[in-house]
């Protein structure tokens, strides 16, 4: 019962879509209506509003971090922490508050990993930053980071059957699966680079008072 309750609370925390909330509060178009139609920081950046993108990134990462941190702080067993990690991540992917139309989970996963262990989170985030800096593809950076996250986990903590390690692996698999469309675009050379502004985003910003 304790695990179920903790997972439910974590899922509800994860269901808060900061991309939609921040965009609405700042008078911007709904990120689900332009660009990749993904409610995440990268797509919000396509609106041209960097502040909104940063707030989205921080908010999505924070909810992943706070859910796992609270589980640890309350002294829940590792199996409960593992379910909390997965639940907050699933909440972001399929938010009950937004008709289950969520993001791809990169920032939320980063927050979860930082709470699991700061070195694990920082190593994974650094991997994302390096790939993003050199190739300018957010999706490629996310995919590479997702592949390396379980590797970093094994390197740091060994190959024991800790349930949190399985949660990290599950999140990595889900994150790659959520990027399957991006993989096709990358292979076809049609993927948008970081900083690209979609025409739809510009139109959406104009409709909302030119705040893009």
UniProtKB/Swiss-Prot annotation:
Probably interacts with PlsX. It is found in: Cell inner membrane. This is Glycerol-3-phosphate acyltransferase. It is a multi-pass membrane protein. It comes from Burkholderia lata (strain ATCC 17760 / DSM 23089 / LMG 22485 / NCIMB 9086 / R18194 / 383). GO terms for molecular function: acyl-phosphate glycerol-3-phosphate acyltransferase activity. Belongs to the PlsY family. The chain crosses the membrane at residues 3-23, 78-98, 115-135, 155-177. GO terms for biological process: phospholipid biosynthetic process. One of its GO terms (cellular component) is plasma membrane.
């Amino acid at each position: 019962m304790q695990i179920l309750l903790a997972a439910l609370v974590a899922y509800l925390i994860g269901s808060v879509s900061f991309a939609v909330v921040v965009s609405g509060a700042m008078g911007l178009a709904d990120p689900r209506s332009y660009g990749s139609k993904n409610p995440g920081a990268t797509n919000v950046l396509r609106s041209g509003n960097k502040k909104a993108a940063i707030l989205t990134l921080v908010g999505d990462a924070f909810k992943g971090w706070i859910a796992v941190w609270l589980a640890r702080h309350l002294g829940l067993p590792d199996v409960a922490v593992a379910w909390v990690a997965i639940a907050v991540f699933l909440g972001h992917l399929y938010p009950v508050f937004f008709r289950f139309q969520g993001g791809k989970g990169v920032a939320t996963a980063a927050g979860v990993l930082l709470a699991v262990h700061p070195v694990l989170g920082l190593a994974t985030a650094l991997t994302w930053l390096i790939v993003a800096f050199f190739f300018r593809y957010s999706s490629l950076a996310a995919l590479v980071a997702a592949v390396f996250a379980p590797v970093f986990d094994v390197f740091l903590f060994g190959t024991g059957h800790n349930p949190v390690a399985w949660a990290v692996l599950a999140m990595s698999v889900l994150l790659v699966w959520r990027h399957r469309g991006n993989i096709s675009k990358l292979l076809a050379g049609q993927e948008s680079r970081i900083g690209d502004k979609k025409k739809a985003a510009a139109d959406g910003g104009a409709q909302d008072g030119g705040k893009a």
